[in-house]
Amino acid sequence: MNATTAPLPYSTTRLHELAHLLIANIRELAHAGWTPATSSNFSHRLDEQHAAITVSGRDKGRLVEENIMVVDFDGLAVGRPLRPSAETLLHTQLYRRFPEIGCVLHTHSPVQTIASRLYAGSGVIRLEGYELLKAFDGNTTHETAVEVPVFANTQDMQVLAAQVDALLDKQSMWGYLIEGHGLYAWGRNMAEARRHLEAFEFLLHCELELLKLRGTR
């Protein structure tokens, strides 16, 4: 480090570890077809002020360590002048609000996108009576219901983040859908966030299949 280079305000060792964790998991999700056409974004809490997050516009199945950048909880790049996803604020608002959240995953599977369109009018999908509801942290029985919010899509992330915050003031959430877009899910760590993501995917798929079998919407 020369005299004009300031030290980085985060651990590069920890960033290296998280980059490998993110890349390995993202590659699996990409191979499942949940991140088409460079879509989707993924992050992990780095420390009390920073998050590691995927850069914008990269094929998520072919990420390398240089494609993982650092942002502060205002969504601003730290360390390297890279461009984070336009949806970075939807990640950082969760880290800022909930110190226990360690990982946020955003995917665009066909199931998630179709469900978000079908239920956009009601603004919510009610998942009830499924054994897999126990996959969500804190749930211990199938005799419960989880409501998945469906927010209108917008390119104004400040507006969308405010809408998410307002709903978080009223209810517990493990994730939400954006109309015609995809799913956000989170957890205390990568394993929990993936469990929540996979549970949502399975349960939404079940709901769509039930609609087809019933011949109703």
Curated annotation (Swiss-Prot):
Gene (name only): mtnB
Family: Belongs to the aldolase class II family. MtnB subfamily.
GO biological process: L-methionine salvage from methylthioadenosine; monosaccharide metabolic process
Annotated binding of Zn(2+), by residue: H106, H108
One MF term in the entry's GO annotations: methylthioribulose 1-phosphate dehydratase activity
Biological or metabolic pathway of the protein: Amino-acid biosynthesis; L-methionine biosynthesis via salvage pathway; L-methionine from S-methyl-5-thio-alpha-D-ribose 1-phosphate: step 2/6
Cofactor remark from the record: Binds 1 zinc ion per subunit.
Keywords: Amino-acid biosynthesis, Lyase, Metal-binding, Methionine biosynthesis, Zinc
Taxon lineage: Bacteria, Pseudomonadati, Pseudomonadota, Gammaproteobacteria, Lysobacterales
HAMAP family referenced in this protein's UniProt entry, alphabetically: Salvage_MtnB
Reported function: Catalyzes the dehydration of methylthioribulose-1-phosphate (MTRu-1-P) into 2,3-diketo-5-methylthiopentyl-1-phosphate (DK-MTP-1-P).
Protein species of origin: Xanthomonas euvesicatoria pv. vesicatoria (strain 85-10) (Xanthomonas campestris pv. vesicatoria)
This protein's name: Methylthioribulose-1-phosphate dehydratase
